[in-house]
Regions:
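N-terminal targeting or regulatory segments adjacent to alpha/beta-hydrolase or S9 domains
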Residues: 1-69, 95-102, 137
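Cap/lid segment of the alpha/beta-hydrolase catalytic domain
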Residues: 118-133, 141-176
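Hydrolase active-site cap/lid region
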Residues: 210-255, 308
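Short alpha-helix in the alpha/beta-hydrolase fold that links the catalytic acid
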Residues: 277, 291-299
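Catalytic histidine-centered segment of alpha/beta-hydrolase-like enzymes
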Residues: 312-323
Length: 336
C-alpha cells in the first residue's frame, strides 16, 4: 500500500478516536504507577493456579462466558466473554461438548485471538474473518474480549473507554487482568486440546507478548504490531495525544517507565520463554501508532525476524495478505 494512503488511514483513525472519546475521558490520574506496582510485589502476574476456577460456559452458538477470578473486577468487567470458532473439520459444537464429557483430548489445536484497543461492533467482522481464516485450517479459535471492552464496558461507555486513561495504574491493572485471563483460558484449553497458540493485535499483541514472558508452553505465537514499548506509544503516538497531555500535566514523564517495578509490563524489557521458531511478528513499515523502531528493538532482544509489510496500523488490519500469511504460519506451527 502507498505510504500516503497508509498514513492517511492512521491519521483518520486518530481523529475518530478523539471524536469518540471527547468528553468521556476522566482527568483523574490515580496513584503513582511506580508505587502501585511496587506495592504488588510478586503478585504483579499471579499464576492461573493462584487465581483459581475458570470454566467457560456456552450461552449462544458463538458466545461463551464465565466469571473472571481477577481480584477487584466488578460491574460488567467481572464477566469474561469470548467468541468460539469451530474448526472446518468439525460440524457442530455438540461434538466438542461430547468430547469434553468423555474426558478426551481435542484433535484440533486451539488459538487465542486477542483484539486491539477500542474494538466495537463495526470492527468485529474484521477479527471474525481472521478467526475464520484459522478455523478453515483446522484450528479452534477463541476470541476473548479484553477487560472493559464490548459487553465488559458499562452502560453509556464506549467499548475500551476505561482500558486507557490518565490513570496509568488502572491501565496497567487492565493489562495485568488481560494477561491473567489469557493464561487462564490457555490453561483450560490445554486440558482439552492438543496444542495452544496465541495471536494478538496492538493492545492484544502487548498482552500476548507478556504471556510469553511468563509461560513456556505456547505452541505458536503471532504478534501483530505489538505494543512493545507502552511508554513510546504514550509519549510519541498521535493516537493518544489527548491522553498524553493529561499524563504530563500530572507530572509523569517517560523516565517513570524506566523504573524496575515497571519492567514486567514492558515486552522490550523482558525476555520471552518461547523458541523463536514458534513466533511470528508482523508489523507495518508506515505504522503511526506502534513505531517500526520499537518492533525492531523487540525482534533483536527476542531473536525473532519481523515480517514487514507496506502498511500502517489500520491498513494492516484491513489487508488480507498478512492474515493469510499468519494463518499459514499458525497452521504449520500448531500442526508440526
Amino acid at each position: 500500500m502507498p505510504y500516503l494512503t497508509a498514513h492517511v488511514l492512521d491519521r483518520v483513525n486518530e481523529w475518530f478516536v478523539r471524536a469518540r472519546l471527547s468528553g468521556r475521558m476522566s482527568s483523574h490520574c490515580g496513584t503513582s504507577m511506580v508505587e502501585h506496582m511496587k506495592g504488588l510485589g510478586e503478585a504483579i502476574h499471579p499464576s492461573p493456579q493462584i487465581l483459581g476456577g475458570f470454566e467457560p460456559e456456552q450461552v449462544s452458538k458463538l458466545l461463551w462466558k464465565t466469571s473472571s477470578p481477577w481480584p477487584g473486577a466488578d460491574g460488567n468487567n467481572k464477566t469474561w466473554y469470548a467468541e468460539r470458532f469451530v474448526p472446518r473439520s468439525r460440524t457442530s459444537s455438540s461434538d466438542f461438548d461430547q468430547t469434553l464429557a468423555a474426558g478426551g483430548k481435542e484433535h484440533s489445536p486451539a488459538l487465542i485471538l486477542l483484539h486491539g484497543w477500542l474494538i466495537d461492533r463495526p470492527q468485529l467482522p474484521i477479527y471474525r474473518s481472521w478467526a475464520r481464516h484459522a478455523a478453515r485450517r483446522g484450528i479452534e479459535v477463541w476470541m476473548p474480549f479484553l477487560p472493559f471492552h464490548m459487553q465488559r464496558s458499562e452502560p453509556g461507555e464506549i467499548s475500551g473507554q476505561r482500558a486507557l486513561s490518565p490513570n496509568l495504574s488502572g491501565n496497567l491493572d487492565m493489562v495485568r487482568q488481560g494477561v491473567a485471563e489469557a493464561r487462564l483460558l490457555a490453561r483450560w484449553l490445554r486440558g482439552r486440546t492438543s496444542r495452544v497458540g496465541i495471536w494478538g493485535m496492538s493492545l492484544g499483541g502487548l498482552v500476548a507478548a507478556l504471556t510469553t514472558t511468563l509461560d513456556d508452553d505456547w505452541d505458536a505465537v503471532a504478534l501483530w504490531a505489538p505494543v512493545a514499548e507502552p511508554d513510546e506509544v504514550l509519549f510519541n503516538s498521535g493516537l493518544v495525544e489527548f491522553l498524553r497531555e493529561a499524563v504530563i500535566q500530572s507530572g509523569v514523564s517517560k523516565d517513570d517507565f524506566a523504573a524496575p517495578e515497571i519492567a514486567s509490563m514492558m515486552p522490550n524489557r523482558s525476555d520471552t520463554k518461547i523458541d523463536p521458531s514458534k513466533m511470528l511478528v508482523v508489523a507495518g513499515d508506515y505504522d503511526q501508532v506502534v513505531s517500526p523502531g520499537s518492533v525492531e528493538r523487540l525482534s533483536r532482544r527476542w531473536g525473532i525476524e519481523v515480517h514487514w509489510v507496506r502498511h500502517g496500523h489500520i491498513s494492516l488490519m484491513l489487508s488480507r495478505a498478512p492474515v493469510r500469511y499468519t494463518a499459514n504460519f499458525l497452521e504449520h506451527t500448531l500442526f508440526a
